[in-house]
């Protein structure tokens, strides 16, 4: 098994959990993170619902768990320093999680949109070129988003490439059409097409994961170590389930955008890491495009689940600040790749919601009023 792995964005919500899983399974892990996310969070007054360790404290803890090296590098800018890392380590796998993770943040203004596209796209290009130069047989995994699709496209969303027909002629396999929901999602689409170029030009092996909304705070490794990821609950960086739970804990109504019929794919943090491990352990032979989710819910269904667990919770409908359809629509996503590798959902949304209510201390939360970024 290939055991030499680089995790870019190792301090993030997914990266922190993935590093601990890899170390537990005896991988040699090189973590790269320049901690710029702390600046984004501070700018938006986004505090964690849980205490988190500093990077130095994490590094010390990770090195006690296993073989771990850490580099403070901006992969979108510091090409020479990134090159030195690739020279020093013969990577088998690179997992790129080093992207600004918020659609609302990318919509704040021109500067934030421009920054998001540069930060999230150039990192992919730099990694791919350095793989070509120093580890051409390695496998890169990137987390993209189900939000790169038109959610209301009214057909099954496939995996891989597809062929289309027009006037009796069939095309060569193509990437399924995308329709970004934000500038953040546009940058995700860019990264996918860059990896497609690298496969066609150089034979680079890659897995592009279109992931649903992730919720939850624990994995078995986090439960053992107590080293939590940043749990955002503001409207800019907090994801739907996590944000609703914390709103309830602060005795605030859960804010539903529009009529709440927006359907999305969801999976727990633990299942997201399970999926990543499956793709690490089963590298692609060329370019692999997969969808990653466990269940599909609309917002109203999630609200109802939380209200069953906490009957005192309330909700309100507000005009959606986003440019999205809030009407009911057909939503069916193919997830055959995960099934072929034996993926099984390990944590229900009910269990994970109950767990967050038990673990998070309400007195630790920031009670300042939320601010909403307007798309239009």
Model segments located where?
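Residue-level signature of the cytosolic catalytic core of signaling kinases
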Residues: 179, 233-237, 295, 345
């Amino acid at each position: 098994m290939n055991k030499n792995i680089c995790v870019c964005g190792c301090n993030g919500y997914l990266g922190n959990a993935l590093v601990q899983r890899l170390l537990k399974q005896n991988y040699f892990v090189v973590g790269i993170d320049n901690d710029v996310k702390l600046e984004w969070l501070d700018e938006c007054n986004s505090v964690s619902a849980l205490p988190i360790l500093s990077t130095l404290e994490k590094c010390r803890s990770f090195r006690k768990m296993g073989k771990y090296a850490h580099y403070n590098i901006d992969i979108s800018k510091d090409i020479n320093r990134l090159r030195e890392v690739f020279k020093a380590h013969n990577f088998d796998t690179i997992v790129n999680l080093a992207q600004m993770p918020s659609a609302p943040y990318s919509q704040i203004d021109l500067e934030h949109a421009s920054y998001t596209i540069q930060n999230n796209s150039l990192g992919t290009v730099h990694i791919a070129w350095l793989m070509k130069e120093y580890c051409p047989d390695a496998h890169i995994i990137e987390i993209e988003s189900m939000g790169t699709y038109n959610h209301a496209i009214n057909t099954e969303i496939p995996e891989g490439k597809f062929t289309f027909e027009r006037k009796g002629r069939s095309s060569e396999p193509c990437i399924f059409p995308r329709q970004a929901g934000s500038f953040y999602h546009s940058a995700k689409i860019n990264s996918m097409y860059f990896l497609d170029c690298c496969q066609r030009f150089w034979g680079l092996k890659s897995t592009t994961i279109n992931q649903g909304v992730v919720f939850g705070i624990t994995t078995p490794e986090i439960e053992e170590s107590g080293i939590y990821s940043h749990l955002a609950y503001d409207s800019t960086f907090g994801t739907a389930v996590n944000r609703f739970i914390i709103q309830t804990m602060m005795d605030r109504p859960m804010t539903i955008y529009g009529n709440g019929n927006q359907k999305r794919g969801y999976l727990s943090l633990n299942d997201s890491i399970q999926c990543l491990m499956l793709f690490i352990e089963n590298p692609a032979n060329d370019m692999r495009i997969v969808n990653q989710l466990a269940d599909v819910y609309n917002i109203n269904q999630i609200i109802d689940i939380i209200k069953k667990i906490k009957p005192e919770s309330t909700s309100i409908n507000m005009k959606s600040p986003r440019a999205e359809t809030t009407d009911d629509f057909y939503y069916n996503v193919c997830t055959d790749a995960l099934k072929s590798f034996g993926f099984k959902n390990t944590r229900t949304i009910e269990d994970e919601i109950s767990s967050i209510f038990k673990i998070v201390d309400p007195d630790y939360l920031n009670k300042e009023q939320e601010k909403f970024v307007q798309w239009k």
